Amino acid sequence: MDPYKFRPSSSNDTPFWTTNAGDPVSNNNSSMTVGPRGPILLEDYHMIEKLANFTRERIPERVVHARGMSAKGFFEVTHDVTDLTCADFLRAPGVQTPVIVRFSTVIHERGSPETLRDPRGFATKFYTREGNFDIVGNNFPVFFIRDGIKFPDVVHAFKPNPKSHIQEYWRIFDFCSHHPESLSTFAWFFDDVGIPQDYRHMEGFGVHTYCLINKAGKVTYVKFHWKPTCGVKCLMDDEAIKVGGANHSHATQDLYDSIAAGNFPEWKLMIQTMDPADEDKFSFDPLDMTKIWPEDMFPLHPVGRLVLNRNIDNWFAENEMLAFNPAHVVPGVYYSNDKLFQLRLFAYSDTQRHRLGTNYLQLPVNAPKCPYHNNHYDGFMNFMHRDEEVDYFQSRYDPVRHAEKVPIPNAICSGRREKCVIEKEDNFRQPGDRYRSWAPDRQERFLCRLVNALSEPRITHEIRSIWVSWWTQCDKSLGQKLASRLNVRPNI
């Protein structure tokens, strides 16, 4: 073993107790005192180190998606998509790429029950030969807001009251009463899918519109969908109370136990595609993440399969320190001008540096599994071995060069600097279509949940009236039923 290349690992554990520096500890049961009943001595370094380490075990939890569980596996291409993208990991059917996936709730704290009504996160990290590619999505295909500048506000509204630390619907409906685009997501939130049975029976969506680019430079808009092969299953409200009361980590345990038993969960990756030349032809804006692309207009096409066949080895190292970033794309995949997507490109790396440190990408779970090279040096907790003498670019002593240029979207943008709302809001059509697609019993469950939430005492008559009017514009019969049960007259 080269002592200068040694890295700490439990595979190198000694048979006896030591300090973090490797010094032997002969007694880990008693502190050092002056006599058997005297005061503890400050020179008991092992005790000081043990306590200091303990009081620093926890790191800042994620501001959203704090409660979650990860698993490892592979993604395998099953269908040829080289006409759409030059991405190496999608180069041919049969190609496999290692992945790690993290499932999560969104709003509630680390350790909260996994049976609460809440969107779920579905984040996938592909360790490709061209670098890491992260699809950081949810189990809903839409989101509450369309402009990233409102992201802190919507999270604050859904988070607990800063005075009482209690989550309250009056705060949620007050904030969202200024944002009718949130109706689309509430049509998922208060639906049966608002509480998945577990992570294995849950859909995933990339939510944003991405761009695929082929070798010729042709750009295609794309939406990513994960479809569980075992089907979608949800918990009804009474079931969720029973399950959560018996085991607040039921989804985590289900995922872990299923993989351990060899019952590997699997999802099909499906895509919807659109020619950017057609984006102005629809009643909605295809880059508006509060909208779905109707499947009758944009059918799903299969791409590959995701199989999770290995549990993580250490929850803290591979779940808490796992960091996703929508900005991590590979050649052949790029961003769109979705306003929330654009904000996330900055926000995720920023929060990971706060939570994990400037060198979070050196952590094994986050580091790419391919060679890489840059001059990003030093900083706290830098443990990368480097022996170069040149830490600048360009140099005649270091032959490193620019990478081969890859095609990216090159559409010309023009316009004035301004802060404005998109032209095609179309806030009511899709939630109404979704409601009308349900069977009557499902409609009734949705209505009951909505009525219960809007019946919170602190919600004013004005706010209730706004929501009744909006849902009436989505579907007249829904609005009438809601108005009757809330004793509110629609005001359209």
UniProtKB/Swiss-Prot annotation:
<feature type="binding site" description="axial binding residue">
    <location>
        <position position="348"/>
    </location>
    <ligand>
        <name>heme</name>
    </ligand>
</feature>
<comment type="similarity">
    <text>Belongs to the catalase family.</text>
</comment>
<dbReference type="InterPro" id="IPR018028">
    <property type="entry name" value="Catalase"/>
</dbReference>
<feature type="active site">
    <location>
        <position position="138"/>
    </location>
</feature>
<keyword id="KW-0560">Oxidoreductase</keyword>
<dbReference type="GO" id="GO:0020037">
    <property type="term" value="F:heme binding"/>
</dbReference>
<keyword id="KW-0330">Glyoxysome</keyword>
<comment type="function">
    <text>Occurs in almost all aerobically respiring organisms and serves to protect cells from the toxic effects of hydrogen peroxide.</text>
</comment>
<dbReference type="InterPro" id="IPR002226">
    <property type="entry name" value="Catalase_haem_BS"/>
</dbReference>
<dbReference type="GO" id="GO:0042744">
    <property type="term" value="P:hydrogen peroxide catabolic process"/>
</dbReference>
<keyword id="KW-0376">Hydrogen peroxide</keyword>
<dbReference type="InterPro" id="IPR011614">
    <property type="entry name" value="Catalase_core"/>
</dbReference>
<dbReference type="GO" id="GO:0006979">
    <property type="term" value="P:response to oxidative stress"/>
</dbReference>
<dbReference type="InterPro" id="IPR010582">
    <property type="entry name" value="Catalase_immune_responsive"/>
</dbReference>
<dbReference type="GO" id="GO:0046872">
    <property type="term" value="F:metal ion binding"/>
</dbReference>
<dbReference type="GO" id="GO:0004096">
    <property type="term" value="F:catalase activity"/>
</dbReference>
<feature type="region of interest" description="Disordered">
    <location>
        <begin position="1"/>
        <end position="32"/>
    </location>
</feature>
<feature type="active site">
    <location>
        <position position="65"/>
    </location>
</feature>
<dbReference type="InterPro" id="IPR020835">
    <property type="entry name" value="Catalase_sf"/>
</dbReference>
<keyword id="KW-0408">Iron</keyword>
<keyword id="KW-0349">Heme</keyword>
<feature type="compositionally biased region" description="Polar residues">
    <location>
        <begin position="8"/>
        <end position="32"/>
    </location>
</feature>
<dbReference type="InterPro" id="IPR024711">
    <property type="entry name" value="Catalase_clade1/3"/>
</dbReference>
<keyword id="KW-0575">Peroxidase</keyword>
<dbReference type="GO" id="GO:0009514">
    <property type="term" value="C:glyoxysome"/>
</dbReference>
<dbReference type="Pfam" id="PF00199">
    <property type="entry name" value="Catalase"/>
</dbReference>
<comment type="subunit">
    <text>Homotetramer.</text>
</comment>
<keyword id="KW-0479">Metal-binding</keyword>
<protein>
    <recommendedName>
        <fullName>Catalase isozyme 2</fullName>
        <ecNumber>1.11.1.6</ecNumber>
    </recommendedName>
</protein>
<keyword id="KW-0576">Peroxisome</keyword>
<dbReference type="Pfam" id="PF06628">
    <property type="entry name" value="Catalase-rel"/>
</dbReference>
